[in-house]
Regions:
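Extracellular beta-solenoid/beta-roll
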Residues: 1-8
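Short carbohydrate-recognition loop motifs
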Residues: 8-14
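Acidic, glycine/polar-enriched metal-coordinating patches/loops
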Residues: 15-104
Length: 104
């Protein structure tokens, strides 16, 4: 699991060394809109995966993030490819995801 505490800021980065099967967000404000942008850098030699269907917000149950058109999110697979993924929360609800992908 990738633990993300919004009390520590609203940006972060990770280089994939293993598959990410779930995200655990804490300290997401319960009133209004908040965001977290994550820079994901793909592994240099063997592609890893990122799942958005096992997300917890402030200790709640697992939810699947919503994406434009319901198409989901697939992390870029090229060696060292960079994705910028923004999670948008409204009142600490199910996150909406926007991704800019495959920077190289």
């Amino acid at each position: 699991a990738l633990a993300i505490n919004l009390a520590n800021g609203n940006t972060g980065s990770i280089t994939l060394t293993e598959n990410i099967t779930d995200f655990d967000f804490t300290n997401v404000p319960t009133n209004g809109v908040s965001t977290f942008t994550l820079q994901i850098t793909q592994h240099a030699s063997s592609s890893k995966t990122v799942a958005i269907n096992q997300i917890t917000v402030n200790g709640g149950g697992h939810v699947t993030a919503k994406t434009a058109g319901g198409g989901g999110y697939t992390v870029s697979t090229g060696a060292n490819a960079i994705d910028l993924v923004t999670f948008l929360f409204l009142d600490a609800g199910t996150p909406l995801i926007n991704a800019l992908q495959d920077f190289s």
